[in-house]
From Swiss-Prot:
Contains 4 disulfide bonds. It comes from the Eukaryota. Residues 1-18 form the signal peptide. GO terms for molecular function: toxin activity. It comes from Conus victoriae. The keyword Chaperone does not apply. This is Conotoxin Vc22.1. The cysteine framework is XXII (C-C-C-C-C-C-C-C). Expressed by the venom duct. Keywords: Disulfide bond, Secreted, Signal, Toxin. GO terms for cellular component: extracellular region. The keyword Signal applies. It is found in: Secreted. Transmembrane segments: none annotated.
Length: 90
C-alpha cells in the first residue's frame, strides 16, 4: 500500500513540478571549483544562476587528488574551462 502511495505522490510531483533536471548546460561555474577529495568519491560544485536554478557538475576522483585537475582559471574574470571532467550529467 505504501508503495502505491509513494508512486502516486512521485508522479503527482512530476506532473506539477516537471521532471527533475540532472544538468543545466547554462550553469555558471565559479572560481572555487578546485575540490580535493578525502576519500574515493564523486565530488562536484553546486551553484545558482540568477538566484534561481541549482546546478551540479560531478567528477570522479581519488583520495588526495584534485577532482578537476585540468581546469584553467582566469582569476580576474572568474571564468573557468574544464578540460577533462567526464560527463557532467551523471
Amino acid at each position: 500500500m505504501m508503495t502505491r502511495v509513494f508512486l502516486a505522490m512521485f508522479f503527482l510531483l512530476v506532473l506539477t513540478k516537471g521532471w527533475p533536471r540532472l544538468y543545466d548546460g547554462d550553469c555558471t561555474r565559479g572560481p572555487n571549483m578546485h575540490i580535493t577529495c578525502f576519500k574515493d568519491q564523486s565530488c562536484g560544485l553546486i551553484v545558482k544562476r540568477n538566484g534561481r536554478l541549482s546546478c551540479t557538475l560531478n567528477c570522479k576522483c581519488r583520495r588526495n587528488e584534485s577532482c578537476l585537475p585540468s581546469e584553467e582559471v582566469d582569476w580576474d574574470n572568474r571564468n573557468m574551462k574544464i578540460v577533462i571532467c567526464p560527463k557532467p550529467w551523471f
